[in-house]
Amino acid sequence: MNWEIVIGLETHTQLSTDSKIFSGSSTRFGAAPNTQANAVDLALPGSLPVMNRGAAERAILFGLAVGGKVAPRSVFARKNYFYPDLPKGYQISQYELPVVEGGTLSFFVGEEEKTVNLTRAHLEEDAGKSLHDEFSLASGAPASGIDLNRAGTPLLEIVTEPEMRSAAEAVAYARALHSLVVWLGICDGNMQEGSFRCDANVSVRPVGQKEFGTRTEIKNVNSFRFLERAILFEARRQIELIEDGGTVVQETRLYDADRDETRSMRSKEDAHDYRYFPDPDLPPLVIGQDWVDAVRAGMPELPAAQRARFEADYGLPAYDAAQLTVSRAMADYFEAVARALPAGQAKLAANWIMGEVAATLNREEKDIDAAPVSAAALAALINRIIDGTISNKIARDVFAAMWAGENGGDADAIIAARGLKQISDSGAIGAMIDEVLAANPAIVEEYRAGKQKAFNSLVGQIMKAAKGKANPQQVNELLKEKLG
């Protein structure tokens, strides 16, 4: 039997506010345990929550960016459950009336564009954290404890429809969402610090079946690689279980990266188990049209708009435009390079950034902001390819030297110091061709007998004689002339 995977994602995006969603405590990461929790965060009697306007503003910005409906009136609700790191015994969230409803997010899986519908985005507070190596007893023995620094940190939970059908598609969506929230400046996107965490709802069903299978939820995956592996494992587990005559149980599971498996955490609750009801201490969040308009006026150019502009203004293919707008920094880098080149050369800039630059960044695990070769420096190098000073092949060697900081990272200085200037004198190239032809009569005859590989062999020998510095286009043209 052929199976189809059905995936929906819930993403907890930590909003980049200086203070918590309902209190004035700092949201700074890495402070000593329980040094950033006040009476509201600790749920002390008599303390009352006050809504953080900045958190609401970031939610509005997100809603506008994805084309969702920003609710003129949304309500905070108490989500009741017990957990050691939840001091109030409930979490303040939104249920029936979220701040954003609907919206879409488009992204590429390989070179295929996909669009996923969003169900909602709602504001809520984060819980605290259980720690097992930060506390000790009076005797000095290690002890577990609760750190409430994170309690009350503002989150925007973004929920998709169950429309994704592969782990690769889910990861591509998560990457696109991550890029968007960082692009908008509403989240720092630091997955190691927990600023962007995904819950994956996974089920399987026979291909062609309309009804969904029983889903499990994989909680708090904070790595794109782990998200893909967790979904793949869970889908395989469910398929094998069903094919062996078992039944999938609705439950919450955790992904164990060391064992590359998911394991049961607890039975999965339904909404009614949380006994949601409106929080009596918080008034409804009322968002007037003037507030929405003010946020819209301050919006940056969105990735989708910039992709369209790159296609229209620079003639880039849709895939290239998508790759170059994965972050504002990458888009700005490309545009700075393209503007420093002659008209019509933007595709060459795109090829270099998606090729040599991206590969080197990935290898060194750096972001474009940390690239030692600036946009201006890369443009200077590409201009030397365009004007024929060096070949594309030699340019890659020059780029590596620039990245390493040789000669101050200056392309012209490296070319001069290494003697890499391309030979474009037709007389000098012609003389080298004559020598190679005279030394290889058998290969010449093979070419004239119709063997194309023989031509490539001759080109290789000519380039070797020129130490790679002969203009490849001129070599090809002159060689064809001489061979008749």
Curated annotation (Swiss-Prot):
Give the GO terms filed under biological process for this record. Answer: glutaminyl-tRNAGln biosynthesis via transamidation; translation
Catalysed reactions, semicolon-separated: L-glutamyl-tRNA(Gln) + L-glutamine + ATP + H2O = L-glutaminyl-tRNA(Gln) + L-glutamate + ADP + phosphate + H(+); L-aspartyl-tRNA(Asn) + L-glutamine + ATP + H2O = L-asparaginyl-tRNA(Asn) + L-glutamate + ADP + phosphate + 2 H(+)
- ATP-binding is among the record's keywords: yes
Query: Could you tell me one molecular function GO term of this UniProt entry?
Result: ATP binding
Question: Which InterPro entries does the record cross-reference, listed alphabetically?
Answer: Asn/Gln-tRNA_amidoTrfase_suB/E, Asn/Gln-tRNA_Trfase_suB/E_cat, Asn/Gln_amidotransferase, Asn/Gln_tRNA_amidoTrase-B-like, GatB, GatB_C_1, GatB_Yqey_C_2, Gln-tRNA_amidoTrfase_suB_CS
Q: What class of enzyme is it?
A: ligase
Answer yes or no on keyword Nucleotide-binding: yes
The EC number(s) attached to this protein equal 6.3.5.-
The name of this protein is Aspartyl/glutamyl-tRNA(Asn/Gln) amidotransferase subunit B
Q: Which organism is it from?
A: Bordetella bronchiseptica (strain ATCC BAA-588 / NCTC 13252 / RB50)
